[in-house]
Amino acid sequence: IVQLARLSAKCGYMGAVGDDALGKDVLKSLRDENVDTKSMIVKPGKITLHTDIVIDDEGRKFIMLNMGDAFESLTSDELDYSAVSSAKVFYTDLLPKEPAITGLKKARKAGVKTVFNMQVGLGTMQGLHVSKEEILSALKFTDIFAPCRGGLYELTGTTDLDACVRYLRDYCKGTLLFTLGKEGSVAYDEQDRKYTVKSCDLEVVDSTGAGDSYMGSFIYQHCLNCMSIEESMKFATMCAGHTCTGIGARFSPDLKTAETFVWK
């Protein structure tokens, strides 16, 4: 969402935080990035979800997640979904499950393009009370499905991308977008035409946030600017590459930086 906002897209965030210092920091951080937080719910006495990230000398990361108790307590009844029906794109990682699935259904009914970015593996999703069956069921409301590599392989039971697509086509008729780290990214359109883009050849300082940068940049060009899948993948790859050249999840480029770094 922050990457989209930095590229000049008008964005809002729906979710829940506690009224603790972490929650206040989250809200301030989003507002500082020009992300609308009107649909954010503040839960009194609750602890905000947060992470600690350890990075090695090669830029690889290990994430320690503290779920808190604000995030998973969010329900559909607490949210105002009017912003969804007026949006151009609804993006979700399907967490927390019930309000996220409700959002997908409302977006689809309103004709809003939907993007489901499964950011964690199947085991983690199940630990967060989302079953494999519920993930697959959500795909019928999804225009672009972008699972992480581990999640994709666990979900489909294979590491062969063409076989992954054959499996997923029973559930999702939209675009399938697979990010593969150093191996680049691969996409299949609705007609199963395959697009492959290599990763950037650069020195990685910290890969944290690269996937978020990729997705935000892809959505910006493909969903909002109607750029082709392949060209959007190339743009997203360069933005994600830029993110890897600095420390932290927020080293993603703004529009001016993207215009110089990405298109140079």
Regions found by a protein language model. Name each.
Residues A5-R6, R108, C223:
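Gly/Ala-rich phosphate-binding loop of Rossmann-like dinucleotide-binding domains
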Residues R6-K88, E259-K264:
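Conserved N-terminal subdomain of the carbohydrate kinase-like
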Residues T158-K264:
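Conserved phosphate-binding/catalytic region of the ribokinase-like
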Residues A110, Q119-K194:
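Conserved phosphate/ATP/ADP-binding segment of small-molecule kinases
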Residues E98-K106, E134-S137:
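A short acidic, amphipathic alpha-helical/loop segment
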Residues F71-D80, E98, G127-E134:
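Active-site glycine-rich loop that binds ribose-phosphate moieties when present
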Residues S85-S86, I101-T114:
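Glycosyltransferases and closely related glycan-assembly transferases
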